[in-house]
Swiss-Prot record:
Entry similarity comment: Belongs to the protease inhibitor I3 (leguminous Kunitz-type inhibitor) family.
Taxonomic path: Eukaryota, Viridiplantae, Streptophyta, Embryophyta, Tracheophyta
Gene: CDI
Stimuli inducing this protein: By abscisic acid (ABA), jasmonic acid (JA) and wounding.
Tissue expression profile of the protein: In tubers and green buds of untreated plants. After abscisic acid treatment or mechanical wounding is mostly accumulated in leaves, to a lesser extent in stems, but not in roots.
Keywords recorded for this protein, A-Z: Aspartic protease inhibitor, Disulfide bond, Glycoprotein, Protease inhibitor, Serine protease inhibitor, Signal, Stress response
Function: Inhibitor of cathepsin D (aspartic protease) and trypsin (serine protease). Protects the plant by inhibiting proteases of invading organisms.
Disulfide bonds: 80-125, 173-184
Protein name from the UniProt record: Aspartic protease inhibitor 10
Originating organism: Solanum tuberosum
Database matches in PANTHER family: KUNITZ TRYPSIN INHIBITOR 2 (PTHR33107), SERINE PROTEASE INHIBITOR 5 (PTHR33107:SF38)
GO MF: aspartic-type endopeptidase inhibitor activity; serine-type endopeptidase inhibitor activity
Glycan-linked positions: 51
Length: 219
């Protein structure tokens, strides 16, 4: 009888040891939950609201500052203002209010959205409030302009991402990437938005370096 009990104990020892080892080392890697998207915040620390209007303000001061505004593109024959510019200084006029239109839900970092100048306008000029990007052969770059569409697979999609310095950066991220944006070369086929000089005005454009650092102030 004692011999049988002894043999039974010997059989149970490997099971106990295996169970203890398995539990302590946690050999099964359970799938981790995806991190929640981070909401984009305004200058007061509030989450951006698709139903609200905001001014896009540069982080810089003096000649490095200035709000983003809607203006007439040089040499343009468009019937309405069709260019996206930045004022030459933070001491001056306020920028043109915009609203951010996400594909769904709230406004989060690194997610596709449309941008629209939120101003009263005549029917003819409604599409000239929606941001897009177009090629400028003279400057050999792609400029931000208006005349886009909302919710369509074209040249009108952007993202807001956290800046490596202060505030946020804007990215241009077309869905039909290779055709519409030869400048979009990062992993997500997006391009940074910065500033170039066009006939004495600071024009928003796609850049390889020195992106525009901005914040959003509710109107």
């Amino acid at each position: 009888m004692m011999k049988c009990l002894f043999l039974l104990c010997l059989c149970l020892v490997p099971i106990v040891v295996f169970s203890s080892t398995f539990t302590s080392q946690n050999l099964i890697d359970l799938p981790s939950e995806s991190p929640l998207p981070k909401p984009v915040l305004d200058t007061n620390g509030k989450e951006l609201n698709p139903n609200s209007s905001y001014r896009i303000i540069s982080i810089g001061r003096g000649a490095l500052g200035g709000d983003v505004y809607l203006g007439k593109s040089p040499n343009s024959d468009a019937p309405c203002p069709d260019g996206v510019f930045r004022y030459n200084s933070d001491v001056g006029p306020s920028g043109t209010p915009v609203r951010f239109i996400p594909l769904s839900g709230g406004i989060f970092e690194d997610q596709l959205l449309n941008i629209q100048f939120n101003i009263p306008t005549v029917r003819l000029c409604v599409s000239y409030t929606i941001w897009k990007v177009g090629i400028n052969a003279y400057l050999r770059t792609m400029l931000l302009e208006t005349g886009g569409t909302i919710g369509q697979a074209d040249s009108s999609y952007f993202k807001i991402v956290k800046s490596s310095i202060l505030g946020y950066n804007l990215l241009y991220c077309p869905i039909t990437r290779p055709i519409l944006c030869p400048f979009c070369r990062d992993d997500d086929f997006c391009a940074k938005v910065g500033v170039v000089i066009q006939k004495g005005k600071r024009r928003l454009a796609l850049v390889n370096e020195n992106p525009l650092d901005v914040n959003f102030k509710e109107v």
